Regions:
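Short loop/turn segments that connect beta-strands within the blades of beta-propeller domains
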Residues: 155, 225, 257, 265-266, ...
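Bacterial Sec-dependent N-terminal signal peptides
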Residues: 1-20
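Mid-chain, structured segments of secreted extracytoplasmic proteins
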Residues: 76-90, 96-97, 262-298
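Extracellular glycan-recognition regions
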Residues: 19-218
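Conserved beta-propeller blade repeats
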Residues: 246-262, 288-303, 335-353, 381-401, ...
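Multi-bladed beta-propeller domains
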Residues: 228-248, 273-289, 322-337, 367-385, ...
């Protein structure tokens, strides 16, 4: 009898372990509501994607049946991912998406961002345990269809749903107050076949769970915020997290060999393989107060850095140049503040933004890496701002962001500062245009419209976008929580197919 009891306990333990096996970033993985056909969730570390298979009659009325990959989480958070059904499917109302749930009980309160097989996209909820969900009282419908990216955000008791067609900004689907949802909840991915006799499958990628901080957040007072170092193919939008830390690092450059990235952290510069692994410090001699404005010359031999100094010539950020293999940097700009942003293709000159003569306005300057008399390329008025200046690979243009029109937009001008031409015309605050090595594309970051026009703060809901170098309609290539330090400097891969950037995972 003891042997039978022990065997039963082992079998039960194995079943529970199978349901809660860690799957990628998720600790929970289970069928909810005991569907007749068991589901599964798998994670592919090669591309950091998920595959969910599941059955179930529905997620509706007073009880649910579906497959769920989830974490226990509390407080405010943002859930974002790309979704695609596999195969034609049996029922047009097969569904996948994000779900926030009070418990694993089949009749638990929940609120879900749902994408159906026929394209119907809705936010649905059950307010109370065992409550019967009703149409249309317990759902909000998206106006469009064909969405691929789904986001669900909780801020206090309010839950917001957003959705986007690939390449387009998020649309606000709606919000709902879950007054009876506990602070500690389950949050994760789900799939339901809407037919208890079949199994459906979904592919899910770019899965991110972020913990946003408040607008009054202060890092020195409130502690470190997590960072991810990511790479992304700009043409299919697929992202890879290669390094994570509960602390701040910023602004990756892609090394000329295509095999490593360079980024700043705690005043120093570090290298890491593009596939992840151990970080190694790059020697910058006595210059050890480096910020997020650094980049590599076109010939791959030199590195420009911006670092704080305090001497008779100036106090604040100055531009230096050092060999890419490391060494003691050479000062380029004795006057401060000066922030590097671009190399000339001749590898002998740099451009940077700086304030001069005590006037609180940044302008774009050019100078030889040997120092000497700098040349002002812009002369803007107080209240305006310019930043993010880079040469095109042929040296013909300088691209930059500027608030000449009253909103921060992308511009280009001739290399001598003449012929200013506006490139973006939308409501977003567009910063840091980075030109691909082949000269064909601009990758840049877009802040929300409500951000102050000359500001690029940290910890915001931002987009990375791509557009032709000659102008045209921008395409969204990434939705993330980030901002300052995400992509301040050139980060293209040598083959012009990928970029690197930093996103914030939150506290």
């Amino acid at each position: 009898m003891k042997t039978i009891s022990l065997l039963f306990c082992l079998l039960l333990s194995g079943t529970l372990m199978a349901q809660t096996t860690v799957t990628g970033i998720f600790q929970g993985n289970a069928d909810i509501g005991n569907p007749a056909i068991k589901g599964s969730a798998s994670y592919n570390p090669a591309d950091q994607s998920y595959s969910l298979k599941g059955s179930g009659y529905n997620i509706w009325f007073e009880r649910d049946e579906f497959r769920y990959a989830f974490n226990q989480i509390e407080g405010d958070f943002i859930l974002t991912a790309n979704f695609r059904f596999e195969g034609q499917g049996t029922d047009p109302h097969r569904k996948t998406g994000w779900m926030i749930r009070a418990s694993e009980d089949e009749d638990s309160p929940h609120i879900s961002a749902v994408m159906h097989g026929d394209g119907l996209t809705v936010m649905q909820w059950r307010d109370f345990k065992g409550a019967e969900m009703k149409d249309p009282e317990d759902e909000l419908f998206a106006k469009g269809s064909g969405y691929e990216i789904i986001q669900l955000e909780r801020a206090g008791k309010i839950v917001f749903m957003r959705a986007a067609v690939a390449g387009k900004p998020f649309e606000n689907i709606g919000s709902y107050a879950m007054e009876n949802m506990p602070d500690k909840v389950l949050a994760g991915l789900f799939i339901c076949s809407h037919n208890p006799e079949v199994t459906e499958q979904a592919a899910i990628w770019n899965v991110r769970i972020d913990k946003p901080v408040g607008d009054n957040y202060n890092a020195s007072r409130d502690g470190a915020v997590g960072c991810r170092l990511e790479t992304m193919n700009v043409f299919d939008g697929k992202r890879m997290v290669i390094h994570e830390k509960q602390g701040r690092f910023e602004a990756p450059n892609w090394m000329p060999d295509g095999k490593q990235l360079l980024f700043n952290m705690d005043g120093l510069l570090y290298k890491i393989p593009v596939t992840g692994g151990s970080v190694t410090q790059l020697n910058t001699g006595t210059v050890i107060r480096n910020n997020n404005d650094h980049g590599i010359s076109f010939n791959g031999k030199l590195l420009a850095i911006s670092s704080s100094k305090d001497d008779a010539a100036g106090r604040g950020s100055a531009v230096y140049v050092v060999k890419l293999k490391g060494g003691e940097p050479r000062l380029v700009t004795p006057e401060t503040p000066s922030y590097w942003h671009g190399w000339h293709p001749n590898n002998k000159e740099v451009i940077y933004v700086a304030q001069r003569k005590g006037i609180p306005v940044y302008n774009i300057y050019r100078n030889s890496i040997k120092g000497g008399k700098e040349v002002a390329l812009t002369d803007i008025s107080e209240g305006e701002h310019v930043d993010g200046c880079e040469y095109s690979p042929d040296g013909k243009y300088i691209y930059y962001n500027g608030s000449h029109t009253g909103n921060m937009q992308l511009w280009r001008m001739n290399a001598d500062g003449t012929g200013r031409e506006q490139l973006t015309f939308d409501e977003y605050k567009n910063w840091f245009p980075h030109i691909s090595p082949d000269g064909k594309w601009i990758a840049f970051i877009s802040f929300p419209p409500d951000i102050e026009k000359n500001s690029h703060p940290s910890y915001k809901r931002v987009m990375l976008r791509l557009m032709p170098a000659g102008g045209g309609e921008p395409k969204v290539i990434a939705y993330l929580y980030g901002g300052q330090g995400t992509i301040n400097v050139p980060s293209w891969s040598p083959d012009s197919k990928q970029i690197a950037f930093v996103s914030n995972s939150g506290k």
